């Protein structure tokens, strides 16, 4: 490339092949197949099948190697020439005691070599100066014009290059008459070269190989010297023209400092533009521009005069031959000659100090050839891991990016830039040519010590295994016994980025194959063999300096040249990137080179095939001309293969025969020439037993085998017969022939090869005669098959003739198979495609043209005659259309049996298909036929589109299409009606159905519409029937009709009315449920309204209650023993209700008797065998705290059931003592099994009945409610009659008087100390003790002494217990029994009546007060009161904390914390709300359901009013009564 052209253009890609698995099985065969294409490029790339992935078999832990060191810019030929030139010019100045500094021009180091070459090409220095063409020189160096760079280049050339050129040409003894130039600018910055010889550099650290670092090293440090004490140094001021002596390396030191000397070597030649003011200097060129600076190591001394004459004669100037002026004589340190300083060119003004050599020594030193270039070995040994770490680190640091992200194109351009750069030194390492036997191959090897897996064994024997390929049967190298490293034995390569392999061809011009096991790509460049000599010529032309000293430079694998440079000179170059798992093949004499893109591992080996033999012979002649050593003897290889011809592959045998013939002819010619020279002596020599260095020609270095010329007098050498005149000067009689075979033995070997080679020719002649029918006789199939078997058995090559034979056999077999298909019958022909008539005739012609005698040809002729006869009949039938369909079908069946496709059969097929289709259409559309579906019609239309057109078919197809369009349109309408949200009325559906009656197609949506209309009509009829019946319809019937009506896709006006009725009925039932049912009740409304069917069975009743409480019991409609149908008859329901009342009464009486017989839990001891009561919790109630139900007489835990509250009785006042009317206290207890509902008042029930009368719907619950109301009113009438009797009225009047008396008495006081004693002591307390305490005045707390709000209602009630006396009335049995029966019947009613309460007071007053029950109730109420106070305090604390938290969180909290506080605050508020709601519900239900009658208990009304105040105040009568203590007995029951 021209200087400055740094842009690299990638060459075209080489061929890439991807063999199939079948092709991949024969490696050398596949390479031979692609050779005609790939050989034109020199290299090719092969991608194995994707599944072919051999395992990596190298022992990674033991793999250690020492890489080579590669300095990139020394690899490229032109760059190396430049560096060698710099070495020479640097040596030129170094010999004179100076060092070279390379100037910078335009901020780039000046290319001195290119400048020198261009000056020579332009005619030389004098011509350029004369023609003023320095600007052209700058232009050719690619410097920008217009900056006066030409003058600057001229200055640098004159100062640095021109003196060296003068010394090289020997013109240093001639004066140069050029004139000095004026007004020159000052030099640019210079950088020292200081380049030692490359091969003399000892390896050191990785970074020390940089040439640039050495060339750009700083100037030597000056040496401190005491100048004041050295008179010689004082005199050294200026040496002739040029700058001051800055390169002397000396500087004055301070007097106070110790003297020490720094040796600086070498000194410097400093080139400057400035001229000095010396007046006595010469005007020669070198005097103007050079100042030679002496070295400080040694000081040159003048020769002193000696008294001896012999010394005097030696002090003579070699120029003028005079010895005078000895003070001006210079002594040469190289040859000891003397020169006057004024006789030199240029003359020197004074004697220089330091080393000095004369011009003759300088010229001799510069003329020495450079040492041969080669790679150095690194000092560090690597493992794969350590080398990989180093390589990846170097690449990532160099490109400043991850190694896998560096583009290959960028890296390729950077590589060629680096190898062409003289100022940038990049050094890499390459683990190349590593012998596999030391560390193992990358492929599995069969003879390895390790046990191979089945998969590894498969790869170990694969032909693509590089250990196997060189020794395959078709390979030539398998006949070489020695393991030739790199050729027959693979070499391993471990590369890093920029590590390169230079332009080269393989030894003996053999093939090579390279496999990249893993790692980053390897970039290859290849040149075909036809351009190999052209490449050598171009490289010699561009770099003659290298090839003059090393003619075999390209064989040393140390030289690169840019592919763009080669391509610019007409050399065809291709490239490729070899990725992991890919092969690269190089062909014989194909030059190739490349470099690695990064860290990778490759393996390579050579192989030789039969087609290589001519190239191998030409290579030996080429080596002979270059005097290069051979790797093996080509003649020995040929003779060894010829000695065993039967073991050779046939292709190889043919090629060896040709080469052997040429070799024998050449040997005869050479021996004849030897005989003509007069050499007659000869002796046999087994050359193969001699070492190669003992049988090499001393002239051309060729390894001899067939013969050699030796001399008795010169036993140390021999020559090949091509150089018989170069052995020695001895007489021919003293020379003798050393031969391996005689001339008679060689033809014998050639004949054996010929037999092996001609065996194929004999076979080929037989095949040729058979295939060409040259003798007029066709061979039988068996004879042709025998020829093919012979080729397979004798391993004949896969030649064109063999392929023709195989093709012929394949055609014969195909014809026989077709004939058998024709004549073997219809069944055998069903699976095989039919032949056309044309194909039948072609088959007949083919059978006649084949070179094989086939007796089946007669059968084919018979079939052809039958087909032609059938054609005539078919044409006659088609000509007389319309023919009978049966006739057409029979003709078609006969044609199918022929096994041949006749053109007329196709027409018959069309006619039959048309007739069949038309029949199907008629049958589908016939009025009497069953209507077909849309799918059938569409199928007919699709079939009609496939058959051939005719007028009748087209008409039927159009009608069918129109019918299908109409049907699909009505189907869409029906679908819309079925799926639309807005339902259509029945009239619309009827209209759609009427329109589709005449369509002869079954329409699914229309059918669904019909069914929906039918169901709608039936639904309307059902609605009319139930609406016009004798009774209102039942709710269940209406709900069923509504559910059915909603599912119908028809708009029904009656549906909306029914939905309204059902909604109203549900609303009434929900209202009734809220009125009767407790919250979370386990009973249904109907169960509550009806009499309890199992009232007499305690166990059944209790188990059912527990099952319902657990959600396990499901009630049915048989509450009254009626079925669902009987519930629809009002009369049956009333009769069943009456019977249920009687059963309930009988059952409760039986239950009371049973439970009364059970022992009381309050008794001191219980009999183990006696039956006991069981609480709802499943345990036996015992001890204090057990309560007995007033209805069923069973016992329960007070804490397991809801109990009445005594505080719901009238409150005491400060002036009266109504609490002493104990018979009015609410001590009545009904268990949850007896009290199943809220028991609303009769007025509420009557309101529900009024609403029920307005419903046009019958509900079982409504009728049950009516029965319950009638039962309650009936009981109320009987109770009123009983209470209105004279005896009972008198008793009631007496009770009223007692109450008035109690109200007139002052309020009793109670002591705080003994207030709770009766509760704590239980039933054992003595009333007299309590009364005694009451008389003690010290412990009495008067109402005036009580602090407001601190009185305790519980303590007050407890203190009144001792004062309770009774009975207050005497009830005769005649009065008591009816009242108790009424009381029992009233308790069975799920209704609250005032008469019930009045009867309860009478019965209570007629018996002593039940102090045990009162104490139990007080204890339970006290326990509940304490729990309520605890909940109240917790609630109050939460409210306060909430306020504090809200106030604190308002200030400086972030949004997230604020939301969290709000969430917690809302949780607290919801909890508070639930607590307040809980208490409010209890209070409301207490006030709603347990308000006593004002007629009989006037005090209760005031008590009720006083309890409705939730907040206690100082003016309240009893401030300690909290609202949550007003929980009623009814509320506790529902909780």
Swiss-Prot record:
One GO CC annotation: nucleus
Cofactor(s), names only, from the UniProt record: L-ascorbate; Fe(2+)
SMART domains, sorted: ARID (SM01014), BRIGHT (SM00501), JmjC (SM00558), JmjN (SM00545), PHD (SM00249)
Residues of the JmjC domain: 458-624
Listed transmembrane segments: none
Location within or outside the cell: Nucleus
CDD domains: ARID_KDM5C_5D, PHD1_KDM5C_5D, PHD2_KDM5C_5D
Positions bearing Phosphoserine: 291, 307, 884, 1342
Zinc finger (C5HC2): 697-749
Annotated EC: 1.14.11.67
Region described as Disordered: 192-227, 1425-1519
Binding site for Fe cation: 504, 506, 592
Enzymatic reactions: N(6),N(6),N(6)-trimethyl-L-lysyl(4)-[histone H3] + 3 2-oxoglutarate + 3 O2 = L-lysyl(4)-[histone H3] + 3 formaldehyde + 3 succinate + 3 CO2
Cross-link for Glycyl lysine isopeptide (Lys-Gly) (interchain with G-Cter in SUMO2), residue positions: 205, 229, 244, 272
Zinc-finger ranges (PHD-type): 314-364, 1174-1235
Domain JmjN: 14-55
Keywords: Chromatin regulator, Dioxygenase, Iron, Isopeptide bond, Metal-binding, Nucleus, Oxidoreductase, Phosphoprotein, Repeat, Ubl conjugation, Zinc, Zinc-finger
Binding sites annotated in the UniProt record for 2-oxoglutarate: 430, 512, 514, 522
Family designation: Belongs to the JARID1 histone demethylase family.
Function: Histone demethylase that specifically demethylates 'Lys-4' of histone H3, thereby playing a central role in histone code. Does not demethylate histone H3 'Lys-9', H3 'Lys-27', H3 'Lys-36', H3 'Lys-79' or H4 'Lys-20'. Demethylates trimethylated and dimethylated but not monomethylated H3 'Lys-4'. May play a role in spermatogenesis. Involved in transcriptional repression of diverse metastasis-associated genes; in this function seems to cooperate with ZMYND8. Suppresses prostate cancer cell invasion.
Subunit record text: Interacts withPCGF6, MSH5, ZMYND8, AR.
Free-text comment on this protein's domains from its UniProt entry: The JmjC domain is required for enzymatic activity.
UniProt protein name: Lysine-specific demethylase 5D
Organism of provenance: Pan troglodytes (Chimpanzee)
Lineage: Eukaryota, Metazoa, Chordata, Craniata, Vertebrata
